[in-house]
Design a protein with these regions (language model features):
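Single conserved hydrophobic/aromatic residue that forms the stacking wall/gate
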Residues: 1-11
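Active-site loop ensemble at the mouth of alpha/beta enzyme cores that anchors a bound cofactor
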Residues: 9-15, 74
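A conserved active-site cap/scaffold subdomain adjacent to cofactor or substrate pockets
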Residues: 13-20, 34
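Short glycine/serine- and small hydrophobic-enriched flexible loop segments
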Residues: 19-27
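Catalytic-core signal marking the mid-to-C-terminal active-site face
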Residues: 31-174
């Protein structure tokens, strides 16, 4: 089975994902739980994670130059902290090099370089930065992590994660 999103691209993964979530839902029901309760159990056991994407649009030729300059600046001056958490690893997929907090540089084993930067923080967070290949924008993918002490603590964990995301955005100047 497969689906097309109307642009000629065939998407098989979404159909597979629907089948898997249906199987998980059936398992949860057989065990007297809802999908939501199962998700809360996962958060309590493994931690809470929140992802947020920021698209910074820079139209025109000057915008393309700004985006290029932003990438060059992040590459030359990687952040030391993001949202109050120390950056412990920086990855540059264009140069295929990664640098740890002590300044040790090692190679990234990938067949093809890509204009992507990633920063990993001490508290388990991650920020990926890349220019769009089709639009005049630079994209920031922010992931923050935290603990969730109980099934009923979701609202608190989510609010704390949102605060972390805002702090990371401030650190990045976006």
């Amino acid at each position: 089975f497969c689906l097309s999103r109307g642009l000629g691209d065939v998407y098989k993964r979404q159909v597979s994902a629907c089948c898997l979530i249906a199987e998980v839902a059936a398992w949860a029901k057989d065990n007297g739980k809802t999908l939501y309760q199962l998700l809360m159990d996962i958060y309590v056991e493994y931690g809470f994670s929140k992802e947020f994407t920021v698209n910074v649009v820079k139209p025109g030729k000057s915008g393309a130059e700004e985006i290029k300059a932003m990438m060059e600046n992040f590459r030359a001056n990687p952040p030391k902290e993001l949202g109050g958490s120390k950056v412990v690893l920086s990855k540059d997929y264009k140069t295929l090099k990664q640098t740890d907090a002590a300044g040790h540089v090692t190679d990234i084993d990938m067949p093809e370089p890509s204009n992507v930067l990633q920063y990993f923080t001490e508290d388990g967070g991650k920020v990926s930065v890349r220019p769009s290949g089709t639009e005049p924008k630079i994209k920031f993918y922010i992931e923050v992590k935290g603990e969730m002490g109980c099934r009923n603590c979701f609202a608190t964990a989510d609010a704390e994660a949102t605060e972390k995301v805002e702090a990371v955005k401030k650190s990045l100047g976006i």
